[in-house]
């Protein structure tokens, strides 16, 4: 590690230590789904609109996406546009936040290289998120080095912008803990220079992690058990109807189990009091529905019909905004990506992000 790095980082941190900064983002491996929405996107929009933060950086993590998609870079490239559209559709405003593409900030790779010298292989192996992701992708026998080290890359992303806050889902807690360990190790060697981030979880406990519609523990694009934010209404309805429920609730009159039932987990995440007056006036609130289901006499299809109405009401404005933000097909802009990036200042934000990261590394 070059000796000058410490002094450059130290002077920069002293100037901006009081700033409140958010860093968060997503991998462009596909369109974003409702798990992303309730797990982090809604919280990002809320934080954006509070005015409590000096700067908010939202990163489309294309370089990180290549760690397990190296044989399909075109998939990553194409989905940069899809993720950007989903951001705009959910209400993220480029006038209030910096939406940028990770690969446009090469300083992040440099910082990640330095951090690799502060982390052991055994520590990465103990990271529960890394372990579960390796198992899910069947990487046990042959783990790509880039994928194995992605907690270090995430730490570089966070600390490069001196982020004080990272809105994320429950599954990202081990990643933030490891980032804090890197910060402590770096600061112990080079002085108090880096900022330790804090994770902000969704305010609604039901939103910490939505299960897949098949009842699996995690909604995942790779498992095909998602409801995408851009789904057409008829596709949402089909997926809701096919959702896993209590396997022992075979007849309407049978008592049903609410705990761990994906249909009720989704209702906890999406349902609001006004939905009952509009879609199910027979009940006053969700507790009444749960009680009826538990004592028997309420069928799964009725509950799913209500859930479909609730989700359609939530996703329809998102879908409409997405259509409005999407580039026109055909004509002079066949791929759409360049026009969208210009329109939403992704390139400008990328240069701004470069500047922030470059200042961290300029005196090396």
Question: Positions of the model-derived regions?
Answer:
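A short secondary-structure junction signal
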Residues: 126-127, 163, 191, 222
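N-terminal Rossmann-like or analogous alpha/beta NTP/dinucleotide-binding catalytic cores
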Residues: 19-156, 274, 310-315, 319-320
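Structured ligand/cofactor/substrate-binding pocket environments in proteins
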Residues: 32-41, 56-57, 62, 71-76, ...
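Short, Lys/Arg-enriched N-terminal segments with co-localized hydrophobic residues
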Residues: 6-17
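Short amphipathic alpha-helical interaction patches enriched in hydrophobic/aromatic residues
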Residues: 67, 71, 163, 248-251, ...
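A broad detector of the eukaryotic-type serine/threonine protein kinase catalytic domain
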Residues: 27, 64-65, 161-166, 224, ...
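Conserved nucleotide- and phosphate/pyrophosphate-binding catalytic cores
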Residues: 174, 180-364
């Amino acid at each position: 590690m070059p000796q000058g790095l410490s002094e450059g980082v130290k002077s920069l941190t002293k100037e901006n230590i009081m700033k409140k900064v958010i860093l968060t983002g997503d991998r462009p491996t596909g369109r974003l789904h409702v798990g992303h929405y309730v797990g982090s996107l809604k919280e990002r929009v809320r934080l954006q609109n509070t005015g409590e933060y000096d700067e908010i950086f939202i990163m489309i993590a294309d370089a990180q996406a290549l760690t397990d998609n190296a044989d399909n870079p075109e998939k990553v490239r194409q989905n940069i546009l899809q993720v950007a559209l989903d951001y705009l559709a959910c209400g993220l405003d480029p006038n209030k936040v910096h939406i940028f593409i990770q690969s446009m900030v090469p300083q992040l790779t440099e910082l990640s290289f330095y951090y690799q010298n502060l982390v052991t292989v055994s520590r990465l192996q103990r990271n529960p998120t890394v372990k579960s992701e390796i198992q899910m992708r069947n990487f046990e026998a042959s783990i790509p080095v880039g994928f194995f080290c992605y907690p270090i890359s995430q730490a570089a992303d966070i600390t490069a912008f001196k982020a004080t806050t990272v809105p994320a889902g429950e599954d990202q807690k081990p990643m933030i803990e490891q980032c804090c360990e890197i910060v402590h190790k770096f600061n112990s060697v080079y002085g108090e220079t880096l900022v330790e981030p804090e994770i902000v979880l969704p305010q609604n406990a039901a939103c910490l992690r939505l299960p897949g519609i098949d009842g699996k523990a995690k909604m995942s694009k790779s498992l095909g058990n998602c409801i995408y934010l851009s789904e057409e209404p008829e596709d949402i309805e089909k997926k809701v109807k096919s959702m896993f429920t209590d396997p022992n609730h075979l007849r309407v009159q049978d008592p049903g189990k609410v705990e761990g039932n994906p249909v009720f987990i989704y209702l906890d995440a999406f349902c609001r009091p006004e939905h009952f007056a509009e879609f199910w006036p027979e009940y006053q609130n969700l507790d009444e529905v749960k009680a009826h289901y538990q004592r028997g006499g309420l069928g799964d299809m009725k509950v799913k019909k209500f859930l479909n109405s609730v989700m359609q009401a939530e996703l329809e404005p998102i879908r409409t905004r997405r259509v409005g933000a999407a580039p026109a097909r055909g004509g002079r802009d066949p791929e759409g990506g360049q026009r969208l990036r210009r329109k939403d200042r992704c390139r400008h934000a990328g240069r701004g992000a470069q500047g922030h990261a470059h200042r961290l590394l300029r005196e090396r």
